[in-house]
């Protein structure tokens, strides 16, 4: 079994790592590195950072604003987030509610809810 990554995968990994090293919000990085609990605003800032980088919809189809990444790219992305000591991504909107809406929702529901879930303007509590 070959479990090595392709050159494209390694380049993708480096792009993510570089983006995190250069652009990850410093106030969140400092708290994470010191083990200080993040506030709600910190978590929102982190998610908005992901959105601005084009990474918030890491597991969403392109047609709904996602990245369209492969499973290998998603794996590498999540590994790089962990390596950079990023906070966990809040799962409810992006990983639970959003996919149900884009899979089973009608067009009105998709238009109304998906953009705000992706931008973290609306989320499940």
Predicted regions and their residues:
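Intrinsic disorder at enzyme termini
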Residues: 1-13
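Generic alpha-helical structural signal
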Residues: 10-17, 44, 111
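N-terminal glycine-rich anion-binding loops that anchor highly charged ligand groups
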Residues: 15-24, 50-52
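Glycine-rich flavin
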Residues: 26-125
């Amino acid at each position: 079994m070959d479990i090595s990554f392709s050159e494209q995968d390694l380049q993708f990994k480096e792009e993510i790592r570089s983006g995190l090293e250069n652009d990850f919000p410093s106030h969140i990085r400092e708290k994470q590195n010191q083990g200080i609990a993040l506030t709600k605003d910190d978590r929102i800032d982190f998610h908005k950072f992901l959105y601005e980088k084009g990474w918030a919809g890491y597991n969403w189809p392109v047609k709904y604003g996602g990245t369209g990444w492969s499973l290998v790219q998603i794996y590498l992305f999540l590994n790089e987030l962990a390596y950079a000591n990023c906070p966990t991504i809040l799962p409810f909107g992006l990983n639970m509610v959003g996919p149900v809406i884009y899979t089973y929702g009608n067009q009105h529901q998709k238009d109304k809810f998906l953009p705000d879930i992706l931008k973290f303007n609306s989320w499940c509590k």
